[in-house]
Amino acid sequence: MAVTRTFSIIKPDATKRNLTGAVTKMLEEAGLRVVASKRIRMSREQAEGFYAVHKERPFFGELVDFMMSEPVVVQVLEGEDAVKRNRDVMGATNPAEAAEGTIRKEYALSIGENTVHGSDSEENAKIEIDFFFDEDEIVG
């Protein structure tokens, strides 16, 4: 397997509960390495731009407001088959359906407040990484 990169967000419900370290620990224990990380408060423009794919969905406004409600931690993760590895450790979007030992099973409050975002493909990972990071901010 090739070493690849993926993008992750530790969402407001997790940062509000001081879970950044616990979530990052689970990512690292899954074989992912944090090669870039920053804690930010997402602007409306950032949230709407990042989630533009959902613009026509009924939950779009609520999602944007949620992502602006508290700080988030945006990260670039690196590891073998990073996208799949990250999605496996995140668990299902609905925490009630997430496997034991996954981030969402352990920490998510609901489908909406589900602790983490992770890229769903290598192609989207690159787009999402480029949305928040300049190449010189990523230190492998």
UniProtKB/Swiss-Prot annotation:
It is an enzyme of class 2 (transferase). One of its GO terms (cellular component) is cytoplasm. GO terms for biological process: CTP biosynthetic process; GTP biosynthetic process; UTP biosynthetic process. It is found in: Cytoplasm. It catalyses: a 2'-deoxyribonucleoside 5'-diphosphate + ATP = a 2'-deoxyribonucleoside 5'-triphosphate + ADP; a ribonucleoside 5'-diphosphate + ATP = a ribonucleoside 5'-triphosphate + ADP. SUPFAM superfamilies: Nucleoside diphosphate kinase, NDK. Pfam families: NDK. Its main location: cytoplasm. It comes from the Bacteria. Its EC number is 2.7.4.6. SMART domains: NDK. The keyword Cytoplasm applies. The keyword Kinase applies. The active site is at H117 (pros-phosphohistidine intermediate). Its cofactor is Mg(2+). Keywords: ATP-binding, Cytoplasm, Kinase, Magnesium, Metal-binding, Nucleotide metabolism, Nucleotide-binding, Phosphoprotein, Transferase. GO terms for molecular function: ATP binding; metal ion binding; nucleoside diphosphate kinase activity. ATP binds at K11, F59, R87, T93, R104, N114. Major role in the synthesis of nucleoside triphosphates other than ATP. The ATP gamma phosphate is transferred to the NDP beta phosphate via a ping-pong mechanism, using a phosphorylated active-site intermediate. Belongs to the NDK family. Homotetramer. NCBIfam families: PRK00668.1 (NF001908). This is Nucleoside diphosphate kinase. It comes from Erythrobacter litoralis (strain HTCC2594). The gene is ndk.
